[in-house]
Amino acid sequence: MAAQGFLLNASFLLILLVLAKPLGSGLARLIAAVPLPGVAGVERILWRTLGITDHEMNWRQYLLALLTLNLLGLGILFCLLFWQEWLPLNPQRLPGLSWDLALNTAVSFVTNTNWQAYSGESTLSYFSQMAGLTVQNFLSAATGIAVVFALIRAFTRQNVHTLGNAWQDLVRITLWILFPVALIIALFFIQQGVPQNLSAYQPITTLEGAKQLLPMGPVASQEAIKMLGTNGGGFFNANSSHPFENPTVLTNLAQMLAIFLIPAALCFAFGEAAGDRRQGRALLWAMSFIFVVCVAVVMWAEVQGNPHLLAAGADSSVNMEGKETRFGVLASSLFAVVTTAASCGAVNAMHDSFTALGGMVPMWLMQIGEVVFGGVGSGLYGMLLFVLLAVFIAGLMIGRTPEYLGKKIDVHEMKMTALAILVTPMLVLLGSALAMMTDAGRSAMLNPGPHGFSEVLYAVSSAANNNGSAFAGLSANSPFWNCLLAFCMFVGRFGVIIPVMAIAGSLVSKKVQPASQGTLATHGALFIGLLIGTVLLVGALTFIPALALGPVAEHFSLP
């Protein structure tokens, strides 16, 4: 079993690197605002048609453009969901959503979280899925990538005040990266058996003679961008454990690769844009090390078997509860780590049914800020925040002004870095405390004791860090939970983006200083170790007390 797990993980990472490197080169061209081959003429027509100028923006203008797009999208999506019953492509005549569920869902998809307090096949029409959710899957992913583009330009430019044109970046990211790659993935899914139609649900008679209604819909097109954009919201309630979303082991592998593809490619793009590919590889090594360790822990925990079944004398060589037999325990464990290391949230197994330690690792990966590969764009700019913190700590230890890529890191950058890093822990801890202190929060818990607390902690961690996965034993479709999690999702997204853009605006105006003899090398093993230590230290100091009350306490209470 250990050898199988090693081969699965190694082959996954190898294929990922082979696919990510060429995509990284394309992303680097977009960061440099160089049109991809053969599309310059198309872009000129688009700019004229859409009224987009070549005027570059400072950080406030860039941020305002992104906020305008996202707030407009939030309002439109809320209206689509609230008045769903009056809109076309609703063959099942599904009613509109309640105001609180519509608000929660709209915020969820605009913020790239895709938390779902509803069952897709019994709640949303095809029009809501296509014109609402799928569109936001593209736009929220493009927003995250645009933010990291601006931050990378801040490191590579000097003595200027502009970070690019947000509208051009969004169009280029969507048309030349997200759409073509998602199209290829969608066609592969269709070939593997994922539905792509607008048919009404199909009544069938099972082999036992029972009547059943099979859900249909444009699944493949939404499934592709759901994974590529690290969105994670499933067309069906069972998400990627549903055979219509993830029918084969090949689609399962493709989905995991799609989740990590752009985050890994952005590391290569960062190195190329910075003029030193070692810088991007250093970040990739740090992410990969934490990822591999987490995969090993989850696989080890899940192959130990279910302690409750073992105590009852039943055969439980591995913990298969909540897992699909077509994937098995190892692929399910790998998927769980992939989807929570990235801010995706799609699941091919029920995380609530993992062992205490097996479920704690995905929760902790979210809590450290989704920086281990992370979401498209958000993962890299989150890791770069930890890079700034690491060079600041190193500067304190050796008595030098911290700098990264020749840019001196001053008080303003460190204040913004601290603010961005502390936003999500505050939301998680205060939100979980509020839920446990109120009757409205506790009434949603379906399990008592440490596991019930773990479900609450997981839900708020998932929302605040824009992941979207859940421990399913929580009845979260209530006004209290819909509003609490919507607030956490919104602040967790834009409460980080705003200080990141402020950092970019400060750094881009600075001069690049030549490296001196005492400059800390930020591409070697020493710095990689320091960066990993910084991520682990912040995560440990912040969340160990909460984890001790949940999964750790549950583990030690097992028979």
From Swiss-Prot:
Pfam families assigned to the protein according to its UniProt record, in alphabetical order: KdpA (PF03814)
Quaternary structure and partners: The system is composed of three essential subunits: KdpA, KdpB and KdpC.
Native source organism of the sequence: Salmonella newport (strain SL254)
Role, per record: Part of the high-affinity ATP-driven potassium transport (or Kdp) system, which catalyzes the hydrolysis of ATP coupled with the electrogenic transport of potassium into the cytoplasm. This subunit binds the periplasmic potassium ions and delivers the ions to the membrane domain of KdpB through an intramembrane tunnel.
Protein's UniProt keywords contain Ribosomal protein: no
Topology within the bilayer: Multi-pass membrane protein
Residues annotated as transmembrane: 5-25, 27-47, 63-83, 132-152, 170-190, 253-273, 283-303, 327-347, 356-376, 379-399, 416-436, 484-504, 524-544
Signal peptide (UniProt feature, chain positions): none
Protein name: Potassium-transporting ATPase potassium-binding subunit
GO cellular component: plasma membrane
Localization terms from the record: Cell inner membrane
Organism phylogeny: Bacteria, Pseudomonadati, Pseudomonadota, Gammaproteobacteria, Enterobacterales
InterPro entries: KdpA (IPR004623)
Disulfide links within the chain: none
HAMAP family cross-referenced by the UniProt entry: KdpA (MF_00275)
GO molecular function: P-type potassium transmembrane transporter activity; potassium ion binding
Keywords: Cell inner membrane, Cell membrane, Ion transport, Membrane, Potassium, Potassium transport, Transmembrane, Transmembrane helix, Transport
Family: Belongs to the KdpA family.
